[in-house]
Amino acid sequence: MQGPLYIGFDLSTQQLKALVVNSDLKVVYVSKFDFDADSRGFPIKKGVITNEAEHEVYAPVALWLQALDGVLEGLKKQGLDFARVKGISGAGQQHGSVYWGQDAERLLKELDSGKSLEDQLSGAFSHPYSPNWQDSSTQKECDEFDAFLGGADKLANATGSKAHHRFTGPQILRFQRKYPEVYKKTSRISLVSSFLASLFLGHIAPLDTSDVCGMNLWNIKQGAYDEKLLQLCAGPSGVEDLKRKLGAVPEDGGINLGQIDRYYIERYGFSSDCTIIPATGDNPATILALPLRPSDAMVSLGTSTTFLMSTPNYMPDPATHFFNHPTTAGLYMFMLCYKNGGLAREHIRDAINDKLGMAGDKDPWANFDKITLETAPMGQKKDSDPMKMGLFFPRPEIVPNLRAGQWRFDYNPADGSLHETNGGWNKPADEARAIVESQFLSLRLRSRGLTASPGQGMPAQPRRVYLVGGGSKNKAIAKVAGEILGGSDGVYKLEIGDNACALGAAYKAVWALERKDGQTFEDLIGQRWREEDFIEKIADGYQKGVFEKYGAALEGFEKMELQVLKQEGETR
């Protein structure tokens, strides 16, 4: 038998994936179960069931049981020696809740290795479905959550986020009102991450220190459930009952929850000393896959844009999210989510290609990139010209809270004057650089105060900027990212593909079981992580003069957002 192995699971909306790594963090096996393609007997599409009438989106929990046996069978077929697996952790789609019935603990304890999980545990749930993050049925409950402590900013201050449809607190509130009898018969409530850990333990696992922050119920500064918010959420059964349902939350993200249940020992050949480590949320797991060091920034440039940062500063705002860091006490995960990302850039790319008569060109981004690189920062040919800036939202945006639309402005940093205009813009050419600048200025604006100076008299900025997703292949976008966000070490493209969450979970298991006393995740994984396998430097970061020019543009950008919000009569 060779060295120890560790498994990271990723239970996402459309699949369950398992990634097996060794102590050197090398991936040795991968097994996937695609819900639509591989499951039997569930009326799902893209992993979920949709009830349009009530804006509900949910998944059958039994589907996930079928998937877990399926993924483990896949690893068995590939020849994994399960006896070498020393630790297991996981990542779960955030915010989703699982409602266990009164027989849950007994059924988990009495699993028969000759039968499937689905056959034995389908009766373990008081409610057969788990709400998905795409669910938007809780507007009424969100309004109540936002108002309960005296406003969205107060809720964000306490729990790290204002109320969101997908967050577990508003979902539980709606659930206990819609199904009061089922709620009474619910013995425990798990998040998707702790549900996964529970299956391996053979009893219900506690919630994870980071994932619990996606509920609108956990007071981050106090490190405890917020009594007032529990009161709002609990309904007639009362606060103590809800506390029992949720259970205690251990502070250590690497705590040993216990050994694997004998079901897996007998059915697959796991060793009896295989340890279960808390599973975390998919976004927290992503920052572990890097590993993201304090003040590093990661920008996911997909259809939407997600910005993740590890920071020691807790500066909540209704437009952003803060979570406890999944492994490192004293750090937080900062997150921003935008609806308009790649789609908005593609609109302008297509308009440029149409105007140039090159719609069928083999590299659709070639013209967009060329124009972006040839255009001066903020469209200023000379310093006395006004700065061109705009907002480009083909779909309604959440940061800031605005309808779909386009707004263009000229800003004069010398006197602070701002004018909405369509004149002086050469459309769509001027919009290529303007949209990339607009997206990155918004990130810089909202992450102000979270970074420190890297030294040598440099202004506060990230150490590194990592780009992932489709947009990371684009050299022009990378160059502008470095000019606006800085990055004393540069801008890097990260190639983890779609394995980031499972990889982060596997690394978490390695750290939890191989750390020395007091050794942080960043230290242990940082020593073993071979960055040349995953990252490539694609652009310079901080450039003196350019970074400062964008600092001046930031004031105009903030004014522009506020003016458009005022015009549209919407508040953030």
From Swiss-Prot:
General function of this protein: Highly specific D-xylulose kinase which participates in the catabolism of xylose. Xylose is a major component of hemicelluloses such as xylan. Most fungi utilize D-xylose via three enzymatic reactions, xylose reductase (XR), xylitol dehydrogenase (XDH), and xylulokinase, to form xylulose 5-phosphate, which enters pentose phosphate pathway.
Domain of life: Eukaryota
UniProt keyword list: ATP-binding, Carbohydrate metabolism, Cytoplasm, Kinase, Nucleotide-binding, Transferase, Xylose metabolism
Induction section of the entry: By D-xylose, L-arabinose or L-arabitol.
Catalytic activity, reaction form: D-xylulose + ATP = D-xylulose 5-phosphate + ADP + H(+)
CC terms in the record's Gene Ontology section: cytosol
Residues annotated for ATP binding in this entry: W365, G470, G471, N474
Subcellular location: Cytoplasm
PANTHER family, A to Z: SUGAR KINASE, XYLULOSE KINASE
Entry EC no(s): 2.7.1.17
Parts of the chain that traverse the membrane: none
Record-stated family: Belongs to the FGGY kinase family.
Keyword Thylakoid in record: no
GO molecular function: ATP binding; D-xylulokinase activity
Protein name as it appears in the record: Probable D-xylulose kinase A
Residues that, per the record, bind substrate: H95, R166, D282, N283
Top EC class for this record: transferase
GO-annotated biological processes: D-xylose metabolic process; xylulose metabolic process
